[in-house]
Amino acid sequence: MQTRNAFSWLKKQITRSISVSLMIYILTRTSISSAYPIFAQQGYENPREATGRIVCANCHLANKPVEIEVPQAVLPDTVFEAVVRIPYDMQLKQVLANGKKGGLNVGAVLILPEGFELAPPDRISPEMKEKIGNLSFQSYRPNKTNILVVGPVPGKKYSEITFPILSPDPATKKDVHFLKYPIYVGGNRGRGQIYPDGNKSNNTVYNATAAGIVSKIIRKEKGGYEITITDASEGRQVVDIIPPGPELLVSEGESIKFDQPLTSNPNVGGFGQGDAEIVLQDPLRVQGLLFFLASVILAQIFLVLKKKQFEKVQLAEMNF
């Protein structure tokens, strides 16, 4: 009886441990996956400044390319693809928050014209769903459904991101018109160099906060360094803290200048932005164009037939 009770108690403890571990993993993954877009969402009402600069560039300092591909024109109430490409060398490894090396993640923000929005799931074709994969898109704000964010997601799998977009219908949305509209995109690969509060991440270069002699370098147990700089003229000491990740470039006894790099720059990623144009096409205009082209073709056909008939008449008169 005691053996059975002990076995039952052990089984409950194992089940509880597995459940707790699974909950921690899920919460951690959720926190990590939602952290980066939230930085911009919490700090800025609009991700695109009046100058045209997308605010993600405030934290991702390196400039890298990004590409966007959209149709030249779309009809009202139509689902189409906006493809964002974030190219980078897949062999690169970035510095993670714990100082270790890992793969790069990517993220993107898509700023659509007013009225354009994420297509509902029941309007997305199976072919488009296959291109989208397991990506989860969200609106930048509940009242800004035309601005979409995604990421961070693994770069090796999602360096090309397909957004399913639904075009508006001017017949139901009076503030939308049949015009040419701009679309703006921002895309990053890798972690940022500065947090929204202004503090540096461990994915950037660290500079000396004072000039003098490097009198002491202490390697911390969990990684990183404490560098003591002594100013010989004033006799004061300054301690610079280096987090785990960047590679140290100075040594004890070395004379350094103010703002001199103490570490290498481990950043291999960066942010880029681009734009494209799309025309919301009036179906009646398309029908009118088709009618015009058809009339031109018919006119050409009748002209050819008339010419051949005229030639036959001329030939008959000559034979007569």
Swiss-Prot record:
Q: For this entry, list what GO says about its biological process.
A: photosynthesis
* Key words of the record: Chloroplast, Electron transport, Heme, Iron, Membrane, Metal-binding, Photosynthesis, Plastid, Signal, Thylakoid, Transmembrane, Transmembrane helix, Transport
Subcellular localization(s) per the UniProt record: Plastid, Chloroplast thylakoid membrane
Q: InterPro entries in the record, alphabetically?
A: Cyt-f_TM, Cyt_f, Cyt_f_lg_dom, Cyt_f_lg_dom_sf, Rudment_hybrid_motif
Entries under Gene3D superfamilies matching the protein: 2.40.50.100, Cytochrome f large domain, Single helix bin
**Per the record, GO CC terms?**
chloroplast thylakoid membrane
Tell me if Transport is a UniProt keyword of this record.
Answer: yes
Endpoints of the signal sequence: 1-35
Instruction: Report the cofactors.
Output: heme
Q: Where is the major localization of this protein?
A: plastid
Q: Give me the residues that bind heme, please.
A: Y36, C56, C59, H60
Instruction: Look up and give the membrane topology term.
Output: Single-pass membrane protein
Q: How is the cofactor bound?
A: Binds 1 heme group covalently.
A GO MF label: heme binding
Which residue spans traverse the membrane? Answer: 286-306
Quaternary structure, per UniProt, is: The 4 large subunits of the cytochrome b6-f complex are cytochrome b6, subunit IV (17 kDa polypeptide, petD), cytochrome f and the Rieske protein, while the 4 small subunits are PetG, PetL, PetM and PetN. The complex functions as a dimer.
Q: Which family does it belong to?
A: Belongs to the cytochrome f family.
Q: What is this protein's name?
A: Cytochrome f
Q: What organism is recorded for this protein?
A: Solanum lycopersicum (Tomato)
The protein's gene is named: petA
